[in-house]
Design a protein with these regions (language model features):
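Fungal secretory targeting signals
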Residues: 1-22
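Loop/turn elements at helix/coil->beta-strand transitions in domains of secreted/extracellular proteins
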Residues: 129-132, 177-181, 214, 232-234, ...
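Structural alpha-beta junctions
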Residues: 203-222, 267, 317-323, 397
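C-terminal active-site rim and adjoining tail of enzyme catalytic domains
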Residues: 238-240, 244-397
Length: 397
């Protein structure tokens, strides 16, 4: 016979173990298969979207800045910050080196990463910082089966597909239902030898944008921007690609605004593009990205030229066609200059006495501070986080 004195410690151990297990179950609840699947998708998307974590930043004013606007506010009346070539934030030398084996399959050569890199913060940080418009460039991967992100010949990630990254946006919008996101999708040319926006590419993009998930999260209105209330918790598609290799019914089935590439004048200082001919709805766009000053002009002059083009368009947005869409790109480069001006130099200056005023961003900060009470529309930045109050200044106009 065992004595009660022997059983007591055993009973205590069993009860303590059960209690610990119960506590662990409370602290770490079992995840559903759907949650595990989403976690896997977000992990694959992380080289472009960033690591999805619920941080304190998600509760900041910039993460929920649209809360302060009424539902009846028209999107064309709002000042909305965006990022140009959003997916390039992680394109470091290490990233380029890690992707060389894929780039070699594409049979292209790439320049140093600073020629392609236009951002240095992930999409999740951009969202929390108040960015709401994203410029995304896609093409087929080396296998010609999956849509991924490029900047010219520079593949941005081997694992982060277009569809994966969209799930990052969907998840973020679920956590921020007051916000509206606008995604500009553009087919990227020159990604690899013999690549083209063919029927297979177009069908792949169509399938992504008409999936069950996309139908839930994309605003289904076609051909016009509505109110903030209609767009909250959803994505508005800004379509900078054609489906001309597919029957017309495919284009008819896609929501959002269509900006035909043939009408988007390359390197345009002042583009006028009618995106809805029936209602005569027009977008006014500045996309003067490639400077054409004489070789050797230097960073200071080229920054000044780009600043002049940007502020001229923002002034037009504040004073003309107040019920129309204005879309201004503050981004630029002059990589054929000697020495070259990379996107970072154009945005922030080159850190020498030759650019004492900084780059376009620093100069725009002062300009935006002078535009209090004005509508300037969508403004697309490179390296948006410098100066640190640039985005907040746009939001506070």
């Amino acid at each position: 016979m065992w004595s009660s004195g022997i059983w007591a410690p055993i009973a205590l151990f069993v009860l303590t173990t059960a209690s610990i297990r119960q506590q662990n179950n409370v602290l770490q609840p079992t995840r559903s298969l759907a949650q595990l699947a989403l976690q896997k998708v977000l992990s694959d998307a992380s080289p472009i979207f960033g690591d999805y974590v619920h941080s304190n930043a998600s509760n900041t004013n910039t993460a929920q800045w649209m809360k302060r606007y009424l539902d009846i506010t028209k999107l064309v009346h709002m000042n909305i910050p965006g990022t140009h070539d959003t997916s390039t934030w992680n394109y470091s030398q290490a990233t380029q080196d890690s992707l060389n084996h894929v780039t070699n399959l594409d049979r292209v050569s790439v320049l140093p990463p600073e020629y392609y890199r236009c951002q240095d913060r992930p999409i999740i940080d951009m969202l929390d910082a108040g960015i709401r418009v994203f410029d995304l460039r896609f093409a087929f991967d080396a296998t010609n089966t999956t849509l991924v992100f490029y900047h010219s010949q520079a593949l941005q990630s081997e694992t982060a597909t277009v569809e994966d990254v969209l799930f990052g946006f969907y998840q973020w919008l679920d956590c921020h239902p007051s916000e509206a996101v606008l995604l500009s999708f553009q087919y990227e040319d020159s990604t690899k030898a013999y690549a083209s926006n063919n029927a297979d590419v177009q069908l792949a993009m169509f399938n992504i944008l008409t999936s069950d998930a996309a139908r839930k999260y994309f605003v289904q209105t076609k051909g016009e921007l509505g109110t903030l209330g209609e767009a909250r918790g959803k994505i508005t598609l800004l379509r900078r690609f054609d489906l001309d290799r597919l029957p017309q019914s495919y284009s008819d089935a896609l929501p959002g605004l269509h900006f035909p590439p043939a009408l988007w004048r390359d390197n345009g200082l002042d583009i006028t593009l009618t995106y809805n001919t029936e209602k005569n709805l027009t977008a006014y766009i500045e996309d003067y990205y490639g400077l054409d000053s004489p070789i050797g002009s230097g960073a200071a002059l080229n920054i000044q030229w780009k600043y002049n083009a940007t502020t001229a368009h923002l002034t037009k947005a504040a004073t003309q066609y107040l019920d129309s869409l204005f879309w201004t790109f503050a981004s630029s480069e002059y990589d054929t200059d000697s020495p070259p001006e990379t996107p970072e130099i154009m945005a922030l200056g080159n850190g020498t006495e030759y650019t004492p005023l900084g780059g376009v961003n620093q100069r725009l900060l002062l300009f935006l501070q002078s535009m209090k009470g004005k509508r300037v529309g969508i403004v697309m930045f490179d390296f948006y986080e410098t100066p640190s109050n640039l985005v907040q200044t746009l939001l506070d106009i």
